[in-house]
Amino acid sequence: MSPSEAQQFLKENQVKYILAQFVDIHGSAKTKSVPAEHYKTVVTDGAGFAGFAIWGMGMTPNVDADYMAVGDASTLSLVPWQPGYARIACDGHTHGKPHEYDTRVVLKKQLEQITARGWTFFTGMEPEFSLLRKVEGKLLPADPGDTLSKPCYDYKGLSRARVFLERLSESLRSVGIDVYQIDHEDANGQFEINYTFTDALTSCDHYTFFKMGAAEIAAELGLICSFMPKPFSNRPGNGLHMHMSIGDGKRNLFEDKSDKHGLALSKLAYHWAAGLLKHAPALAALCCPTVNSYKRLVVGRSLTGATWAPAYICYGGNNRSGMIRSPGGRLELRLPDASCNAYLATAAVIAAGMDGVINELDPGAPQNDNLYEYSQAQLDAAGIKVLPQNLHEALLALEKDEVIRSALGPVVDEFLRLKHMEWVEYMRHVSDWEVNSYLEFF
């Protein structure tokens, strides 16, 4: 969108303010509100921020220049739930250059090796979330009647949340995000809204916009829309399954219908999958970045019969118990959860996948058994390893993964520093479970 086209767009839609928006290292949206007549400044010089005040930007309060959020003109859109406002996704710059700690910048750098081959990397995010209300300090599903022990696809649960779901879906559709289905998931108060896949950078921009809208629309209704991976201990958690493929402008390069395994996958797709499997422990840190994330990935079953989360490092066909599923002609990485920074997680996925492609790694045979029912002896016999079972294990794996660290640059060091602090803080916390179990036990 040219500057003149943008100004016309803003005028026609009576936009008064533009949200110059980027994310911190946690994937949380950060903004400044800029009067619409200063649009040109946002896409040239950028909106200025004190970088030290933002998590994970690797900046100091006494030396570094301001963090400048420079707008990507192709992302300018209305904010449907906030009349009179538009949003533009920004790349961080310092000293006139892209800021290497900005995760959108990090993703764009990883995408360069894809585009250099004449390829486009496509992703489709599947955000799961919990729609909740707070009653006397206790979190409950937004719908008091949403109490089924196995609520997946329940009509009543879906229908009674329709005010929120319709408002969010229509907001997304009005700005060109093609919502194609909505369902009630397998936990009480849990939903998923699916929208059409697109190139990886746009997909991450869409997910950020999705979270912004979901939070604000829920708040207007007196509700909480939570992307916490595991808000309830005995129910499935909130994932962010990532479907992926590579195209060359003519065809899907991940698809080969002559595949001997019957998954309709090409050699390129198998090499890519092998890279993801090789780097799975390190990917866990970036795709599942909180202490709560590993309550979702824990080995075991939930009350509904399955956690729907991949505790096992393997791939298969239409097998939802492994880390990678292939619905046919594409890969679905089931590892990420809804708390991840989509830009950083996607960048890590590209680094891992391309390692598999460059070195022609082999993922072995697909695993199509129900791994939730496997014993440890069966897992050992099949050579199937378990994903990290807590954040600390994942961080140690990331520290040792030179491929991922080298590809993503210094932002990984900053991520590790912050997340080790988070782990220590978590370990110091004395939980109600500990008090109830041990206070008078001895």
Swiss-Prot record:
Signal sequence coordinates: none
Induction: Induced during growth on methylamine.
Effects seen without this gene: Fails to grow on methylamine. N(5)-methyl-L-glutamine is not detected in the intracellular pool of free amino acids from the deletion mutant.
Record keywords: ATP-binding, Ligase, Magnesium, Nucleotide-binding
Domain GS beta-grasp, first and last residues per copy: 13-97
Reactions this protein catalyses: methylamine + L-glutamate + ATP = N(5)-methyl-L-glutamine + ADP + phosphate + H(+)
Any single Pfam family the record assigns to this protein: Gln-synt_C
Disulfide bonds: none
Cofactor: binding comment: No activity is detected with Mn(2+).
UniProt keyword DNA repair present: no
GO biological process, one term: glutamine biosynthetic process
GO molecular function: ATP binding; glutamate-methylamine ligase activity; glutamine synthetase activity
Domain spans labelled GS catalytic: 103-442
Top-level enzyme category: ligase
Required cofactor names: Mg(2+)
InterPro entries linked: Gln_synt_N, Gln_synt_N_sf, Gln_synth/guanido_kin_cat_dom, Gln_synth_cat_dom, Gln_synth_gly_rich_site, Glutamine_synthetase_typeIII
Similarity field: Belongs to the glutamine synthetase family. Type 3 subfamily.
Described function: Catalyzes the formation of N(5)-methyl-L-glutamine from glutamate and methylamine.
Protein name: Glutamate--methylamine ligase
Designated gene of the protein: gms
